[in-house]
Structures are given as structure tokens and as C-alpha cells.
């Protein structure tokens, strides 16, 4: 029988121990890391050039490693050993840690190892999505949190989303669901700042535990420690569902960045259950010093005075409001002091009303052209009837011209007719003052009416128009000081003026249509004229025509308030 030594000789080299996988350890990379930590990126590039090795780190990776590197303080091992509860182990290569792992004191779902959790199912979400919901990843995470009943376990690199945290806090406070949160050590300060801004103190939450987590640690011969970061992201709910992917709980990932998320359920969740318990055992609590520093910084930011925006240049609307405020505080001041400035401000506001006025004038002019067409009537009455129609039309046109030729101030002041009538009944001194300013506008309107009408009948209608314009100008002179009163807004005045004009034009239009219908019906009975039955029929029509002409001549006097 062969002994053990002979059996070992027969075994080929490396047969008992498996060969190490290639590229698992590289001494050249370790030396390059030493050069990077001690001398910076230039020293590392020089080393790689001397060794004729390609670069294995990008510029962002170099900066990240230098930012995570820290000099290991003396006595670090002694401090870690003193933190242990039982330091009786003297094994050179211990298979258990001397530091006791943290306990999941808030509870955990009672799943035994290998217990069946259902058929594995996968739901895939991409963001941004092109379906009914754009932000599917965020909505899927919030739906999982709302459905939690037993436990919520979260591992995240960066957590600053207010909406998701509110859902977690609501489940913790209202439904009393245990919550475990593991965050990257370098990003936990941002999470604490968000909590304090929302008015939540995590150290006082009875159903929430927040701990720090780091990646792998790399030690160099010079005593430098490089701490890795956490890139794991998953949300475990009730031990039966888990959401994982590259989606972080931040506003930028929720609104700007593209990401994906997998929602898993069934037996595959057991792997994430075990991984979370391992990570929770490796985590560290948040120090009281860090909590106090974050709290004091947030309080200092809240106490800082808000910087007011720089003063802007005054605009047209602000100047108008200032002038109205001044006049409302002193309503007895004279109108001429502010008339020039108010003219410039009102032109822009009155542009819409002026356009409607011009369109209405065009409608009246069109009706005038339609009415001037000669109609076949009786020989002894046709000319007089046409002349009468022209008289009525010229009267309305003169009234329109008299109104449009007035200044902007007079047109705007004419909207205060109701207010003027009130003032006449209560304040007699103001009415006597306003009547002294009427001759100038009366003469201007009279000249306009005389130029637009040449016959004697048109002159009488023009005098009537000038009389009405005189009254309106009196009211405008009186209402100059009362126009700025706050109980009569400028917009309401324009609306009232537009309604009055529309009603006035509709009245004139109805009168003209009535006259056209009368003349048309008169032309449809030629047999009566040829059979010498005209006197009886013509007498009846002449009375109707006479009444229509009188009504049309007085059409200017029809106002909505009469």
C-alpha cells in the first residue's frame, strides 16, 4: 500500500488547490495606487509610463479616489477592539467578528431559510416613459411604499426626494410600519438636511432606523485608507417585493435623468432579504456630532434674512397706480395737474374701446350708403322722401362724428353720466362750477355739425346734436375730478361705454331697417298706382313714413337709460 507521501507525488502540481482566477490581483496596479495617493495623478502617470502599462483609471475616478482617501489615525485597531463586548478571542484568523452585529429591533418578516415565497415575477419600468404615466419609476416606488404593511427596508446611495420621504414617514407614523434605511456615508448629510427642512427629527422617530454604510476599504503601505462608496439601490417591502435598478430617490432622477427599475416578487426576493441583513450588520450608526452639526447649520440658514430683489425701474402701470393712489387720498385736487400724464397712460388702455368705436362707425356708414339708393316711388313724393332719409342719416352720422372728434378725456368722462347726476342732486356747488366751462366744446361740436350738413333740415339736426354734445361735455367737465374715485374702476367704465354704444347703434339700425322695409313694401304695389288708387293708399303710407322720419331724426336721443 502506498503511503501518503507517494500519493502526493503522483498528484500534479496545483491539482489540490484551484488556480487563482486571472486579473484578480495585480501588483502593478497596487503600486500605481500607492503613487496616486502619495504623489497625485502626475506621479501615477509617470509610474505607468516607466512600467509601460496602460492607464486603468479615468480622470473622474482619480479625483474620486483622492477625495475618499484619508490617513489612518494611530491606534485605530485598539479602538475597534475596545468597542467589542467580548475580546476573549485569540485566534489568528477568526471566522467571526469580535464586534456584535446590530439587531433588527423593530421586527422582521418571519421567513425561514428556503421558505417558498411564490412564483417569481418581474415588472420593468423605464423613465421617462411614453405611456400614460411619464415618471413610472417614481410612481412604482411610491406605490410599493403605500402598500407596505410589515416592513420597509431601503438601501440607497442618495436620498433627497421629498415626496418619497413623505410616503415613508406617513407609513412609519400612521400605519406604524418598521422602516430601516441604509445610506451612503458621504451622502447622509444631504438626507439629514432634507429631514430637518421637512420638520422631521429621525432620532426621535420610534419606528425608523437610519444607519451609515460604506463600500470596500482599501489600505496602502503608507497608512492611507480609501473608503469605497455604496452603489446598491433596492427597496424591500414586506419581504415579498423588491424594487431595484439604477433609479435614485432624488428629484433629478425623478424629473431629469433617464433610469430604469425592476419590481421583483416571488422566490427571488429571498436573495435581497439576505443581502439587506448582511449590509445592516456592516452598517454604523449616525454620530451625535454629525446630527448636531446638521441641525445647527439648518437653523442658521433659517435665521438668515431673506435678500430682497433689486429694485426695478418704474413701469407705466406702476406709475398709473401711484397717481391713482395720490388722487384717491386727495380727491379735491385739480384735474389739470395730472391731465398730461394721465393722457399718456390712458391711450394704451383705451385702444381696444377705440377700435370697437371705429368699427361701429363703419357699420353706420355702410347703412348710410345702403339707404341713399333711390327707390321708385310716387312722382310727387319720391324726392321729398329721399331727402328725408338723407336728413335722418346725416343726423346719425353727425352724432357719430361729434362723439369721435372729442378728446380722449371727454370720451372717458362721458362714462360717468350716472355719477354726475348723483352729484347734481347732492352737491349743488360743483354743478355751478362745471357749467362755466361749456362754451369751448359746444362751439367745436357745432362747427363739426355745420360742416357735415348743408341743408336746412341737416342744420336743425346738427343743432340738436350740438346740444346733446354740450350736455355731454358739461358732464365731462364736471366729472374730471370724480373720475379718479376708487369706486368707479377704469375697466368698468369702458365696458359700460361699449354697452351703451352698442345699444345706441342697434336702435339706429332697427329704425333704418324699418324704413327700408316700408319703402320696399311701397314699391311692390304698382297696380294700385296705375289704377289711380294712390291717394287712399298713399295717404296711409305717408302717415307711416312721416312717423318713421320723425323717429329716425330723434334716433340720436335714444340712450339706454331713457
Curated annotation (Swiss-Prot):
Residues 424-472 are annotated as: Disordered. It is found in: Cytoplasm; Cytoplasm, Cytoskeleton, Spindle; Cytoplasm, Cytoskeleton, Spindle pole. GO terms for biological process: cell division; cell population proliferation; metaphase chromosome alignment; positive regulation of cell cycle G1/S phase transition; protein localization to mitotic spindle; regulation of ERK1 and ERK2 cascade; regulation of TOR signaling; signal transduction. InterPro entries: FAM83, SACK1. Keywords: Cell cycle, Cell division, Cytoplasm, Cytoskeleton, Mitosis. Residues 425-472 have a biased composition (Low complexity). Gene3D superfamilies: Endonuclease Chain A (3.30.870.10). One of its GO terms (cellular component) is mitotic spindle pole. It holds the Pfam family SACK1. May regulate cell proliferation, growth, migration and epithelial to mesenchymal transition. May also be important for proper chromosome congression and alignment during mitosis. GO terms for molecular function: protein kinase binding. SUPFAM superfamilies: Phospholipase D/nuclease (SSF56024). This is Protein FAM83D-B. It comes from Xenopus laevis (African clawed frog). Belongs to the FAM83 family.
Amino acid at each position: 500500500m502506498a503511503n501518503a507521501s507517494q500519493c502526493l507525488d503522483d498528484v500534479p502540481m496545483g491539482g489540490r488547490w484551484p488556480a487563482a482566477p486571472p486579473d484578480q490581483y495585480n501588483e502593478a496596479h497596487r503600486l500605481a495606487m500607492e503613487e496616486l495617493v502619495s504623489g497625485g495623478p502626475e506621479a501615477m502617470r509617470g509610474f505607468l509610463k516607466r512600467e509601460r502599462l496602460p492607464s486603468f483609471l479615468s480622470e473622474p475616478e482619480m479625483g474620486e479616489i483622492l477625495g475618499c482617501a484619508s490617513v489612518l489615525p494611530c491606534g485605530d485597531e485598539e479602538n475597534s477592539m475596545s468597542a467589542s463586548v467580548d475580546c476573549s478571542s485569540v485566534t489568528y484568523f477568526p471566522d467571526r467578528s469580535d464586534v456584535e452585529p446590530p439587531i433588527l429591533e423593530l421586527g422582521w418578516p418571519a421567513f425561514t431559510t428556503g421558505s417558498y415565497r411564490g412564483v417569481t415575477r418581474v415588472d420593468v419600468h423605464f423613465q421617462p416613459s411614453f405611456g400614460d404615466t411619464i415618471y413610472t419609476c417614481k410612481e412604482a416606488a411610491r406605490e410599493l411604499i403605500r402598500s407596505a404593511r410589515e416592513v420597509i427596508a431601503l438601501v440607497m446611495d442618495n436620498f433627497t426626494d421629498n415626496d418619497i420621504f413623505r410616503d415613508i414617514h406617513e407609513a412609519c407614523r400612521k400605519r406604524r410600519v418598521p422602516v430601516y434605511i441604509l445610506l451612503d456615508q458621504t451622502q447622509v448629510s444631504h438626507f439629514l438636511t432634507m429631514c430637518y427642512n421637512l420638520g422631521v427629527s429621525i432620532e426621535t422617530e420610534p419606528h425608523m432606523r437610519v444607519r451609515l454604510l460604506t463600500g470596500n476599504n482599501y489600505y496602502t503601505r503608507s497608512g492611507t485608507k480609501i473608503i469605497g462608496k455604496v452603489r446598491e439601490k433596492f427597496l424591500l417591502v414586506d419581504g415579498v417585493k423588491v424594487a431595484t435598478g439604477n433609479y435614485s430617490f432624488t428629484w433629478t432622477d425623478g424629473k431629469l435623468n433617464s433610469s430604469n427599475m425592476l419590481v421583483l416578487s416571488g422566490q427571488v426576493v429571498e436573495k435581497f432579504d439576505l443581502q439587506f441583513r448582511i449590509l445592516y450588520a456592516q452598517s454604523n450608526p449616525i454620530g451625535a456630532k454629525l446630527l448636531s452639526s446638521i441641525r445647527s447649520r439648518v437653523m442658521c440658514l433659517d435665521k438668515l434674512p431673506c435678500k430682497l430683489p433689486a429694485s426695478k425701474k418704474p413701469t407705466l402701470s406702476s406709475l398709473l397706480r401711484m397717481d391713482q393712489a395720490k388722487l384717491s387720498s386727495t380727491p379735491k385736487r385739480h384735474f389739470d395737474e395730472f391731465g398730461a400724464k394721465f393722457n399718456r397712460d390712458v391711450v394704451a388702455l383705451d385702444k381696444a374701446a377705440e377700435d370697437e368705436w371705429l368699427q361701429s362707425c363703419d357699420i353706420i356708414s355702410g347703412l348710410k350708403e345702403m339707404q341713399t339708393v333711390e327707390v321708385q316711388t310716387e312722382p310727387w313724393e319720391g324726392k321729398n322722401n329721399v331727402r328725408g332719409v338723407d336728413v335722418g342719416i346725416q343726423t346719425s352720422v353727425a352724432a357719430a362724428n361729434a362723439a369721435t372728434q372729442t378728446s380722449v378725456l371727454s370720451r372717458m368722462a362721458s362714462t360717468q353720466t350716472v355719477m354726475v347726476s348723483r352729484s347734481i342732486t347732492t352737491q349743488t356747488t360743483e354743478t355751478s362750477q362745471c357749467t362755466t366751462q361749456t362754451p369751448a366744446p359746444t362751439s367745436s361740436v357745432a362747427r363739426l355739425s355745420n360742416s357735415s350738413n348743408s341743408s336746412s333740415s341737416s342744420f336743425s339736426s346738427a343743432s340738436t346734436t350740438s346740444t346733446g354734445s354740450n350736455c355731454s361735455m358739461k358732464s365731462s367737465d364736471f366729472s374730471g375730478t370724480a373720475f379718479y374715485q376708487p369706486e368707479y374702476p377704469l375697466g368698468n367704465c369702458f365696458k359700460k361705454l361699449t354697452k351703451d354704444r352698442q345699444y345706441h347703434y342697434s336702435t339706429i339700425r332697427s329704425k333704418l331697417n324699418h324704413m327700408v322695409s316700408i319703402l320696399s313694401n311701397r314699391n311692390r304695389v304698382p297696380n294700385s298706382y296705375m289704377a289711380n288708387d294712390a291717394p287712399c293708399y298713399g295717404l296711409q303710407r305717408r302717415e307711416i313714413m312721416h312717423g318713421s322720419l320723425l323717429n329716425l331724426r330723434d334716433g340720436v336721443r335714444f340712450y339706454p337709460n331713457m
